């Protein structure tokens, strides 16, 4: 049935990929982003004319020598405006040493994101956390690995819950010769994209390639902890109802009956789940739990960043195409990229209710995502972008890697070392902050995984 004009989206709709995230192909919202960027840089306050609007669209995308669409320099290679200072405390004090960072600035930033973006967790590791093997360990000679499955269970004041995880361990690994591991926060169908029986192999979770290069490969499904969809009950309780409303069953029911402005949202729940999987990996013979990398794509990339910020046991944090509220800097005009308002409106369950205070304030935020990325220091951080993923704002993701790097300098380390031009498939791997811009769209591919492993080979071995 054709909708009335009053019911149609004001700025158009966006095509969504396999994980539900808007792809680089956008209509009205993209154009609105271009206009917003032009107004910011040209200080235009009046409505733009149709002619100027058309010029904006034409200039928004350019084509390189290889015929690949890349962000236009005028809009997407600009510098951030009035970027909040990373190395300045809340009281204006200059943060000059690693000790200052650890005692003053890092706790301030972590508290800010907890109370204003992701929400307060009622518990970290539950006292009754249990690991129950699912069946026997399976010898998989076809991929030269042992597959282990587990049910991770726990309970709270109001109920009990659990979720499954899996790891493939190279048969050559042993307690005396443990191997590093990659843990994927899978935000797509496990059967289609991360089949643990390995009957269906995809680039999204290339177990065979990880094993070949000497890494264990672990995975869990984010929605086993918290559903990834909006529920009407959210408007009353501040976080999406998980499983059976109203909190009579399911994950959230373990600790709270009512939600508040700062109650944790789904991203924090998923990140919490990654930490619980790491708890289990610490008990698995043959895995070096001091060298575990957490990886996420899209909303999973946002989750990986928060997991790395809240759990310092993760040695490497890889955020792939994480976009707005992930690795993308907000204080810069990046045409076609997502906004905070869009994330809050489309996925309110990801965040705490307090995060709505920043709707429409992207360019004047009192913080930005380089603060979040810096919480990983002095450990390893990798941010990955895709040239055709306009929604994630590749240039903004790159800028976060650049502007978070001073936190690593405090420890006497290099952050992002730009030892080449910002170009497609020219990775930066020298410092402890890595980055690459892949050719292609919003996805997690073998190219991305290969660069993550190259970086880990260099810094994690």
Model-based region annotation:
Residues 276, 319-372, 397-420, 427:
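Mobile cap/lid helix-loop segments that gate and shape the active-site cleft of serine hydrolases
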Residues 65-118:
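N-terminal pre-domain segments of enzymes
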Residues 346, 402-461:
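C-terminal catalytic histidine-bearing segment of alpha/beta-hydrolase fold enzymes
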Residues 377-392, 439:
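Conserved strand-to-loop "acid loop" that flanks and positions the catalytic carboxylate
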Residues 184-276, 280-283, 326-331:
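Cap/lid segment of the alpha/beta-hydrolase catalytic domain
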Residues 276-335:
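Primarily recognizes the serine-hydrolase "nucleophile elbow" in alpha/beta-hydrolase
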Residues 125-176:
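N-terminal cap/lid segment of alpha/beta-hydrolase-fold proteins
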């Amino acid at each position: 049935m054709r909708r009335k004009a009053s019911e149609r989206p004001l700025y158009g709709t966006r095509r969504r990929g396999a994980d539900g995230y808007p792809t680089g192909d956008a209509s009205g919202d993209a154009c609105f982003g271009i206009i917003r960027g032009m107004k910011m840089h040209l200080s235009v306050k009046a409505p733009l004319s149709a002619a100027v609007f058309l010029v904006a669209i034409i200039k928004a995308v350019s084509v390189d020598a290889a015929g690949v669409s890349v962000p236009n320099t005028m809009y997407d290679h600009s510098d951030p405006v009035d970027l909040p200072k990373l190395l300045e405390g809340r009281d204006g004090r200059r943060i000059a040493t690693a000790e200052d960072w650890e005692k003053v600035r890092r706790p301030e930033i972590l508290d800010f994101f907890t109370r204003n973006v992701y929400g307060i967790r009622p518990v970290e590791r539950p006292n009754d956390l249990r690991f129950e093997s699912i069946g026997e360990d399976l010898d998989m000679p076809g991929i030269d690995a042992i597959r282990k499955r587990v049910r991770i269970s726990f309970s709270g004041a109001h109920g009990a819950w659990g979720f499954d995880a899996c790891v493939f361990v190279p048969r050559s690994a042993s307690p005396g010769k443990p191997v590093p591991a990659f843990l994927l926060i899978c935000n797509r169908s496990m059967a289609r994209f991360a089949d643990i029986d390995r009957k269906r192999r995809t680039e999204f979770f290339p177990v065979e390639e990880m094993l070949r290069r000497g890494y264990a490969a672990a995975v869990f499904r984010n929605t086993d902890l918290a559903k990834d969809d909006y529920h009407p009950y959210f408007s009353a309780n501040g976080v999406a109802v998980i499983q059976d409303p109203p909190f009579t069953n399911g994950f959230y029911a373990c600790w709270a009956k009512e939600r508040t402005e700062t109650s944790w949202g789904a991203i924090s729940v998923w990140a919490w789940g990654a930490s619980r999987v790491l708890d289990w990996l610490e008990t698995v013979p043959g895995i070096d739990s001091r060298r575990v990398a957490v990886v996420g794509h899209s909303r999973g990339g946002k989750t990986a960043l928060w997991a790395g910020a809240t759990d310092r046991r993760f040695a490497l944090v890889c955020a792939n195409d994480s976009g707005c509220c992930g690795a993308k800097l907000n204080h810069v005009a990046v045409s076609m990229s997502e906004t905070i308002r869009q994330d809050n409106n489309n996925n309110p369950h990801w965040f705490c209710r307090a995060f709505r205070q920043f709707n429409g304030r992207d360019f004047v935020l009192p913080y930005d995502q380089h603060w979040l990325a810096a919480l990983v220091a002095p450990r390893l951080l990798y941010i990955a972008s895709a040239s055709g993923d306009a929604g994630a704002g590749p240039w903004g993701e790159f800028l976060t890697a650049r502007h978070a790097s001073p936190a690593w300098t405090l420890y006497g380390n290099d952050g992002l070392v730009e030892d080449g031009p910002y170009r497609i498939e020219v990775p930066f791997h020298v410092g402890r902050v890595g980055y690459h811009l892949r050719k292609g769209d919003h996805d997690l591919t073998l190219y991305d995984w290969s660069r993550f492993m190259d970086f880990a080979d260099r810094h994690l071995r």
